[in-house]
Amino acid sequence: MRLGIVLGLAAALTVAASGAAAQGEAGRLTIELNKLEPQGEACRSYLVIDNATEVAVAELVLDLYVFNRDGVIERRIALDTREVPPGKTQVRLFDIRDIGCGEIERLLVNGVLSCRDADGERSDCEDLLALRSRAGVDLDG
């Protein structure tokens, strides 16, 4: 995996997503890497998150690793996707600093660092995840 650990929470912006952008699997929390675009010295990443479960996720923090074209880990990110209401599709943006989009080969969801609903911590969030990519860069876990 990539060298260097960055545990700063990525700044996530919420944007209304069109329903056609990502239809998730029933009963799953689908996370799609939809697009990467250059943003200065960073690579802006667009995640489409579709909560097709009945779980009102109050907090979801992913343990995300960024791999370069040589298969070497560039960065570790604790990605806070924030609230993910059931039956909703949302877009989250985050910047991967100091790396060009063309240098990224793969994003690995290594696990779930934190997952909470209104009743507190949940242990099943990782099992609910379905990962996919439309960005020409693998998103797997």
Would you name each region that the model predicts?
Residues 1-8:
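Bacterial N-terminal signal peptides that target proteins for export
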Residues 16-19:
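N-terminal signal peptide c-region/cleavage motif recognized by signal peptidases
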Residues 22-48, 126-139:
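Low-complexity, acidic Ser/Thr/Pro/Gly-rich terminal tails and inter-domain linkers that flank the onset
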Residues 28, 98-141:
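Terminal connector regions
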Residues 50-54:
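Short solvent-exposed strand-capping/beta-turn motif centered on an Asx-Ser/Thr pair
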Residues 56-59:
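Short acidic/proline- and small/hydrophobic-mixed sequence motifs that coincide with surface turns
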Residues 62-64:
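Hydrophobic beta-strand segments
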Residues 67-105, 115:
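Intrinsically disordered, low-complexity Pro/Gly/Ser/Thr-rich segments with frequent PxxP/GP/PP motifs
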